Amino acid sequence: MVLKVRVPEDMFGGDVEEGFGPVADAFRANFASGAEIGAACAVYQDGAKVVDLWGGYRDGRTSRPWEEDTMVTVFSTTKGVASIALAVAHSRGLLDYDERVATYWPEFAQSGKGEVTVRQLLSHQAGLPVIDIPLKLEDLASLDRMAEVLALQAPVWDPGARHGYHGITLGWYEGELIRRVDPAGRSLGQFFADEVAAPLGLEFHIGLPDDVPAERLATIHGYKPPEMLFHLGEMPRKFVTGFLNPRSITYKAFGNPRVLGLINNYNRRELLRLEIPAANGTGRVRDIASAYGELATGGRRLGITSVTLDALANSAVPPSGGLMDVVLRLESIFSLGYVKPFPSFRFGSSAGLAYGTPGAGGSFAFADPDTGVGFAYAMNRSGFHLWDDPREVRLRSALYESVLDAGSQRPDASR
C-alpha cells in the first residue's frame, strides 16, 4: 500500500505573488486532506515566477523535510522536458518534423520503418512502444547497444495508422535521433544539459550525476502493480488489465526491462544515473515550470523559433485510424513529444494551445502560450490516475479558474 503520513501545518515553504493566493490555498488543502507526503508546485507567467511552493516530507519514513532545493523524479513528465531538446534541434535546422527518421539515422529503416517521419515518431504513431529483445540495465547504459536494438525493432502496427503511448521507448528513440543530428554527437541528456539547462540555469537532469547528494532527492512512495486493481475507479480498467497481462502490448510497453515498470525502483541510484528520457528525469519542480515558461513566452533564451513554437502549439495531426490509444486503451492525443488538450483531459486556457506531459503518480507540467504560463507540479506519494490527479487538478483549477479566469480544467462531462 502507498505510504500515508500526517504532515504538520507548518511544514511549508515558498511564496506566491499578489493575486495568486488561491494556488497556495489549494496546495495547503492537498496536505490537509492527507493526500500528500511531500510536493512542490511552481508557476511562471510572462517570464516571472509567480508561484513557488514546497512542503511536507521528502522522505515520509524518516520525516526528512522537503526543502527549497529538493529534487524529485517526475517519471513521464520527463518526456515533455526532454522534447525541448528536439525543439531546439528543430529550430537550428538540425531536423525537420516531417522528414523521415531514416534520413538522419539510416539504420532505423530496418524492419519496415523506412517511411516513419519524425512527427509520427514523436507523436506515438510509429508502432514502437515495445522492444522485443530482452534488455538488462547494463544495456541501457550503452547508447550504441540501444541504437542497435532500436533500429532492429519492427512496428507492432502500421505507422501513422494508429497511436499508442510509447511509455519508455520514446525517450530512447529521441535520444538516438539527437545523437545523429547533433554535430557534436551528444546524448540527449548531455545536449539538454548544455543547450537547455545551462542557458536557463536549471537543475534538472536526464541521467542524474553522481555528485548530486542523496540528501537532496525525494524518496518516491509508490505501489506494486497488483494494487492498481483496488483503484479501478481512478485508473482505467482496460489499462489495468492490460498492464497486468504479460501477453498485452500494454504490459510489454512498460516491461522491458521489468525493473522500469515498478515505481519504487526509481529510488535506485543505478537507475537514476542512466539516460531514460521518457521516464527518469530528476530535478527541482520550479525549474520544470521555468523551462515551460520559456516556451510559453517566445523561447528567446533557447533560440527557439516562432515556426517551432507554432508547431508545438498547433493542433495535433491524428493517426488515420482514430484516437483510441493501443497501449493506454482509451482516447488520447499526442503531438511532437507532448500531450495536447482533449475532451477527457483539458488543461491550459480554452484556446487549446497548451502542451505538456503528465507523469506516473500524479506529476504534470505544461506550457500555455495563450496565458504565458509555465506550470509544474510533482510529488513523492504516488496516486493512481493516468492524468488529472485530484491534487494537481486542484492546483491547476485554482490557477486557471480562480486566478486567471481562463478556462475550465475539468474533463468534458459529455465524453
Where are the predicted features?
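Active-site-proximal loop and beta-strand segments within enzyme catalytic domains
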Residues: 5-6, 60-169, 176, 259-261
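Short, conserved catalytic-motif segment at the N-terminal edge
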Residues: 13-74, 96-99, 152
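Alpha-helical scaffold elements that line and support the substrate/ligand-binding pocket
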Residues: 43, 47-48, 73-95, 121, ...
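A short acidic/small-residue loop/turn micro-motif
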Residues: 57-59, 381-384
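Active-site helix/loop module of the DD-peptidase/beta-lactamase fold
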Residues: 68, 76-77, 91-133, 151-152, ...
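Active-site-proximal alpha-helical segments within enzyme catalytic domains
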Residues: 124, 169-177, 275, 279-301, ...
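Active-site Gly/Thr loop motif
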Residues: 222-285, 314-370, 406-410, 414-415
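Short, gly/Ser/Thr-rich active-site loops of penicillin-recognizing serine hydrolases
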Residues: 276, 297-300, 308, 313-324, ...
